[in-house]
Amino acid sequence: MITGMTIDAGTSLAPAFMLTLNSQDITSNFSDRLISLTMTDNRGFEADQLDIELDDTDGKVELPLRGAVLTLWLGWQGSALLNKGDFTVDEIEHRGAPDILTIRARSADFRGTLNSRREESWHDTTIGELVSTIAKRNKLTASVADSLKKIPVPHIDQSQESDAVFLTRLADRNGATVSVKAGKLLFLKAGSAMTASGKPVPQMTLTRNDGDRHQFAIADRGAYTGVTAKWLHTKDPKPQKQKVTLKRKPKEKHLRALEHPKAKPVSKKTKAKKEPEAREGEYMAGEADNVLALTTVYASKAQAMRAAQAKWDKLQRGVAEFSITLALGRADLFPETPVRVSGFKRVIDEQAWLISKVTHNLNNSGFTTGLELEVKLSDVEYNAESDDE
């Protein structure tokens, strides 16, 4: 049974939850038997997961049917509980002795047609129209970031791919992230901390006193210093080769604690040349010291640029990892929330962070929240240098 928890001020806090099964409140049936409850909030098409362990030493717990829908509310007694979503039961485990029943459920939105393979070709459309079409046939509501809606998609094949896999591939090419939450198909700019309507997600501030464990690691930033992508099309009957080098130009002059050594401003004299697009060429984001070459050959220079920029940004976000377990659970935190921290090492405190994964744990020790964070990129402009070969 979950008990109260005392904090330093002497105030007694007790975690609280509410659980419904097919819209019927079953909280009272579970509360005295609850050993642990873990809810994992993922981003992208990795399904959110709910794990519940119940004491069944008297053998009176009835096994729920696979396919039943659980809805979870989570928080603290005396405060409004937050709805954490619907979960469809797909695994049941009973073990002993002592007898324990484990119920595992995953996001209801990730079952069914989204995972069915399809064969389809898309022509002369936009990301906004494409996502809306897929959302409609999966009985979802599309929500696409304004900066992505009008990106043209001249042609792309969905060959024996599920809609989930296909949309993930499309998102990777265009620096986006795709997920399904509360009946909505979200297609948003990756790492932007923006909602689909273009409004910023409010920043949260965490101090070291909020957590009881943390871990920080800096990755090998020198592994890749740039990304190249090639394109090939037939607009120009006389093939020309063109190489375009991308460099970051911060909008504000400030020192980012974890900035990639190759992600630096360039001279103001550098300007992108306006000229007819070459039939084929190569686009590079970053520097040429140690380049990651994308294997896909894109249909246009614009597509190659977006793919290279998306991959380069992803590499930049991975230069460091930071995780923290909050001693007092925060049901209001979710992936893509921007976070500032204080009380740690300078290099950690000075960096802007973005939540990539949230794990809520409820057991006899209390209610805790584990956060996994990645580097939040500042808004940047790009300068391109074109060299004809």
Curated annotation (Swiss-Prot):
Q: Please give the GO cellular component terms listed in this UniProt entry.
A: virus tail, baseplate
Skewed-composition ranges (Basic residues): 240-254, 263-272
Instruction: List localization entries.
Output: Virion
Coiled-coil regions listed: none
Keyword set, alphabetical order? Late protein, Viral baseplate protein, Viral tail protein, Virion
Q: Any transmembrane segments, and where?
A: none
Q: What induces it?
A: Expressed in the late phase of the viral replicative cycle.
- Enumerate the residue ranges of region (Disordered): 236-281
Assembly and binders: Homotrimer.
Instruction: Describe its function.
Output: Putative baseplate hub protein.
Report the sequence similarity comment from the record. Answer: Belongs to the P2likevirus baseplate hub protein family.
Q: What is the protein named?
A: Probable baseplate hub protein
